[in-house]
Amino acid sequence: METITSRDNAKIKYACAVRDTEKQRAADGVFFAEGPKLCLELAKSCTPRVVYATAAALVKTPELARFDPAEIAPHVAEKLSGTKSNQGVFALFETPVPPADILNTARRILALEGVQDPGNVGTLLRSAAAFGFDAVVL
């Protein structure tokens, strides 16, 4: 496996575009995730299109090997993260498409719009699960 060492690599630029622009995410049906825990958890229900990881992250999280990750240099990880302190794992996942009839068959639906704080979304999702909601629309 060859390590991606250029911050100007086309694949890295594309991942940054997905991370930064809703238009890119919507057009390609993908979303960006960062961090080993989040990426492994998302992989249980979403299809990873590509996974990027530093050598250190691959040693720390050997479970990532099943996704055939592209190895990236630490300075490339900084570009993907936008920070110097990151966990070195990034992925693009296919956006799941809910069944077309979900709004007709679900009995309890939580609809969220314009929630500013991601922590509030997490709280609302956990509450919806605890109260037996069938669907959440973001």
List each model region and its residues.
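Structural motif
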Residues: F32, Y52, F90-L92, I109-A111, ...
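Phosphate- and divalent-cation-binding pockets in alpha/beta enzyme and binding domains
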Residues: E41-L42, K60, K79, N120
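A general structural signal for well-ordered alpha-helical segments in protein cores
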Residues: I12-A15, C39, A73, A77, ...
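Boundary-proximal intrinsically disordered activation/regulatory segments immediately upstream
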Residues: M1-V59, L138
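Residue-level signal for inorganic ion chemistry
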Residues: G35, A91, A128
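Short secondary-structure boundary segments
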Residues: A55, T95, G114
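RNA substrate-binding interface of SAM-dependent RNA methyltransferases
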Residues: K44, I102-L138
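Glycine/small-residue-rich loop that forms an oxyanion/phosphate-binding "nest" at active or ligand-binding sites
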Residues: T61, A65-V97
